[in-house]
Amino acid sequence: ASLVADALALRGYAQADAAQRRQQAWESSCGPMLAGMSRATEIRRGVMTVIVGSSMAMQEVSLQKETLLQRIRQELPEQKIRDLRFRVGRLDS
């Protein structure tokens, strides 16, 4: 295998690992009920985007936004998350 292929494989692994860590931190922050209705999809410029599966779930996370933000900051302090953005969408497993 080439050095470039090895580097790309390592980068892909690192991205998958970061996605898994982000989702685990979200689940730990929001609890099992909300975790089953939502997925943390990305963190960009200090904003974590969370996809929720329904308008009911959107209302629930919106009502709990400040608490969820405090918890996710504790779970991922190195990410310096300053805001949560919620969107209704399809939850891909």
Language-model features, listed with the residues they occupy:
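Short, non-transmembrane amphipathic alpha-helical segments
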Residues: M58-K80
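Single-stranded RNA-binding regions, centering on S1/OB-family and related RNA-binding modules
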Residues: P32
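N-terminal presequence-like segments and adjacent domain-start helices
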Residues: A1-S28, G36-E42, E78-S93
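A short interface-forming secondary-structure element
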Residues: R45-K65
